[in-house]
Amino acid sequence: MKIAFVTDTGTGQHPDYWKEKGIYCLPLQITCDGESKDEYTEITYSEVIQKLHEKKVLKTSLPSLGKIQDCFEELKNEGYDTIFAVPICRGLSGTLDSMEMIANQLEMKFVGVDCYCTAVEQGCMIETAKKMYEANIPIDEIIKKLQSIADSCETVLLCDDLDHMKRGGRLTPMAAALGGLLKIKPVLHIGKSTNGKVDVLDKVRTMKRAQDRVIKHLKELNVDSNYTFIVAHVDALDAAKEYAQKIESQIEGAKVKVINLVSAVGIHTGLGCCLLYTSPSPRDCS
C-alpha cells in the first residue's frame, strides 16, 4: 500500500509549504465579480483583505473537481493506491465528500478524516498523520490520534460583523437570528460538538465582555499553560494583540501566538474578527 497525504489551503498555508513536507495540497477557490481564483496561487491574502475593505462580495468554494481529479490521477500514475485526506471540515465545505467520490471513481482506496474545523487544527492533523505513517504506525492508530486531536481542540470566534457569515450560510439559524439583535455580540464556536458548523456559545453586549466570556469558558475546560494558544485575526492586528495579552494575563503561564486568519475563512467572518484556537497537544499542533 502506497499512501498519498492530501489536504487543502484551508490550512492557511501555500501548497508549496506542504509540498516540501511531502503532502499534497489543493487550493480552495475564491470568487469575486464572477471570477473564481485558486487561493494563494492566483489570489494572495493581501488581495483578499483589500477586496474586503472595498466591500466586494466574495465567495468561497471547494477545489475544482477537475483539479482534484488531475491530482489523484497523477498520484495513481506515480504508484499511489490510497488517498489519506484531511481537508476543511464537512460542516463548512463539500471538499471531503468530493475527494472521496473522485478517489472511488479512480478505484483508489480513500481514508478521510473530518477535522470539524479548519486552519491550524486541519494543518496539525494532516502533518501528524504523515509523521505517524513515516514512523510505521498503523493507519487505524493514526485515525484514532487525529480523532483525539479533533475532540480536544477548541475554536472560538468573535466577530464585529456577522453579515458575511449570514450571507455565506456558515451560521446555524440560531446564530444568524442572534446576529440581528441590537447590540448583541454572539460568542461563536466550531468543533466536533457543533459538527463542524459555526454555532452560538453565548451572547453578550460588548466585545470586552465577549473576550471575558471566552476566557471564562477556557477556565471551565481547565485550559492551562500546557495548551497551545493561537489568536488569528482578519486585518485586526492591534485588537488581536490586546486579546492575546488579556489571555496571557488571566491564564497563568499561557503564551499566545498571533497570526492572520485563513483568507477563505476570513471572507465569511469579515474584517475585525478574532479567532482563538486552543489545543492540549502543543507538540502536535504548534
Report the location of each language-model feature.
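Gly/Ser/Thr-rich loops at beta-strand to alpha-helix junctions
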Residues: T11, I88-T95, C117-V120, A236-D238, ...
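N-terminal glycine-rich anion-binding loop in soluble enzyme alpha/beta folds
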Residues: A4-K67
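Active-site histidine-anchored catalytic micro-motif
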Residues: L92-T155
